[in-house]
Each structure stands twice: as C-alpha cells, then as structure tokens.
Amino acid sequence: MYINYLKDLISFKSVTPKSDGAIEYINDLLKQHGFKTEIKIFGDSKSEQVTNLYAVFGSNEPNICFVGHVDVVLEGNHELWHNASPFKVSQQDGKIYGRGAVDMKGAIACFLAASLDFIKNNTDFKGSISFLLTSDEEGKAKHGTKEMLQYIYDQGYKINFAIVGEPTCEKEIGDAIKIGRRGSVNFKLNIEGLSGHVAYPHKANNPLPCLIIILNELTNIKLDEGTEFFQRSNLEVTNIEVSNNTSNVIPASTEASFNIRFNNLHSAETLAKQVEEIIKQHCKEYKVDYKLEYSSSAESFIQNPSDKIKEFAKVVEHTLKIKPEFSTSGGTSDARFVKNYCPLVEFGLLSETAHKINEYTKISDLQKLYDVYYNFLMEIL
C-alpha cells in the first residue's frame, strides 16, 4: 500500500507552507482506521497559516510517534520533469518520480503502511502509535512542529520516542541514523565608508578593502577540528553586494552575508562574539563603521544513544544486514524541536535527489524502509 499512498501524496501540490489537502488526506485515512485525530491551523495571517495534524492510536505508553512534513520545496521548471509534471507521478524502471518522493512523502507513506499493517496484525499491543505532521518544515518552521508539540503536550499527550522521517541515508538504505544536527547561524555585515571619485582616493574611504580582508580571515579561520559525531564547523560566504554600477566611483558602503554551520562545541552567541571581534579589529584599522546582524534558526544538538535509539539501530542492522552509522551531517530539521520532548532518531530514504529536478525513490528502497518501520514497531510494542 505504501506505493499507492506515495502516489496519492505526491499529487498534492503542497509547496511550503501549504498542505493542499495532503494532511487532510492522511487525517481521513487514519481516522478510518481508528486513530483519534486533530488538525490544528496555526499562523499570524492567512499567508502564513500552517496545517498540522496529530493522530494517535491507543492510550498506553510507550507512544511511538512518526514526525514529518508534507510540504515540499518549489518544483522548478516543469519541462525538465518526467511527464512535465512534478506532481503527477511517473513510475519507470522501478523508480517513482515526483516532488517530495524522498523529502519526505515516501517516508510518510511507508510509516502509514507499516503502522496500519501492524495494528491489523497485532490487536493487543501494549503501547500507542502516533503521527505528528506539518506543512511548514521547508519554510520558516515557525507554526509547524514546534508549535504543535507544545499544543499536544498542553493537551496531556506525551511522546516517548520519535522517528523523524527525513531522507538521512547516503548510499544505501540503512547506512546512517541521525542522532543530532549541526546548528546554523546567518550573518549580515554592512560596512560604511565614504564615496568619492576613484582619481581622488584620499578624499574617500573605500569600504571594500576592509570587507575583503575580513572575509578572507573569516573563511580561513579554523573554528574547530570536529568531534566524534560532528564534522568541522564551517563558514560560507553567501552574498556580497555593492550598490555601485559606475566604474569611476568609490562606493559608500558594502554588504556581505555568510552562514556558519556549527557543531556542539559552539553556540550561535559564542560564534557571533568571535566573528565580531575580527570585524571590529579591521574596521577600526580601516576607520570605517560597521553594523553586524545575526540570527540563528537552530542550535546544534547531540543525543547520547538511549536504549530505544540502540534498539532502532539493531532493527536496522537485523532487517537490512547493514550496520548503520550514527550521524549528525546535513542541514537542520524539525528534530531540533522534537529533541526537547523525547529521544529520537532521524531515519528515512536516500538524500541524493532531495530538492532536485526529477526527485525520485526506488521502489525497493520503499520496501526496505517499510520493513524497518514495521519491524521496529514489532520490537518495541
């Protein structure tokens, strides 16, 4: 059934933060199979409204919750997709093409099938199975999983263990389980000089040499050596702007943006202080003014492998005959919100085609993921 569920889910044009009916489809399906469901819409305005779902079968502990998102990134040029439509499934050579196939409608489809089959085959299991789904993970992630978790806990629900269905595997299903994530902090630096004619540099103060020196130092600084579970923190320049289209004018100002992906040796605040010390030193030397702004969407985190995390890893190994590696690579995810409530793993399909034109998953990979999810429910419940 996971193939049918996936095809149905891909057909919804759920570009973040819209559900486009995807969450309602899942809600109806789960309700038909005895789940207690609730849809909540959060958001400050109509354009920011986010659809969220919590559905639970059973009332006993442990509550095993699948956490995911139905929203997808923009599809790009339709003409480059199979069938010229990213929301019309194309099935070829054992693969299913469509936006969201791996990120992450495929994982949702597999856990839907696994949980419904498990409930059908095990009428007296000891715990609960639940879903927490949102339509806002790829975007601002402001009114999605974070807000929904707070809501369900206020209602008296408790999650004992979560599976976040992000596409975590690298080369084959089962090679990686994420137990943490790097943090992310964005910087915007504005340097104010004094404009003038290029023939009279002594009557101006060009902000660009200062910016070049600063960016050179920042991009060459070694923030750390990495840790057991984390790679080195890295800084990447993402944009440089100079509002000057005239070749004989020294610009008055310049602006640069950069991002740091950091491990658990840092926080956004400590990195901001380190960055500003470098900026302050060079701006003083060049006698220019600066303004530095920064914002962080996620701090880094790492979990000590709990008993349930270890059990999940054993299920992966026994099911797929591959020993998974505990990993923290990749970008940010909603796991950063879930970890405040319960232990978790992130485990899903291959990440290779996520967000790309002709995103696809192999049907054989869907079967493997289904098997892991089903076997874990059998083991834990």
From Swiss-Prot:
PROSITE patterns membership: ARGE_DAPE_CPG2_2
Signal peptide coordinates: none
GO molecular function: acetylornithine deacetylase activity; cobalt ion binding; succinyl-diaminopimelate desuccinylase activity; zinc ion binding
Pathway membership: Amino-acid biosynthesis; L-lysine biosynthesis via DAP pathway; LL-2,6-diaminopimelate from (S)-tetrahydrodipicolinate (succinylase route): step 3/3
Active site: D71, E137 (proton acceptor)
Keyword Mitochondrion attached: no
Catalytic activity: N-succinyl-(2S,6S)-2,6-diaminopimelate + H2O = (2S,6S)-2,6-diaminopimelate + succinate
CDD domains (UniProt xref): M20_DapE_proteobac
Keyword Transmembrane: no
Enzyme class label: hydrolase
Binding site for Zn(2+) 2: D103, E138, H355
UniProt keywords, alphabetically: Amino-acid biosynthesis, Cobalt, Diaminopimelate biosynthesis, Hydrolase, Lysine biosynthesis, Metal-binding, Zinc
Names of required cofactors: Zn(2+); Co(2+)
Entry EC no(s): 3.5.1.18
A matching Pfam family: Peptidase_M20
Subunit structure: Homodimer.
Function description: Catalyzes the hydrolysis of N-succinyl-L,L-diaminopimelic acid (SDAP), forming succinate and LL-2,6-diaminopimelate (DAP), an intermediate involved in the bacterial biosynthesis of lysine and meso-diaminopimelic acid, an essential component of bacterial cell walls.
Protein's name in the database: Succinyl-diaminopimelate desuccinylase
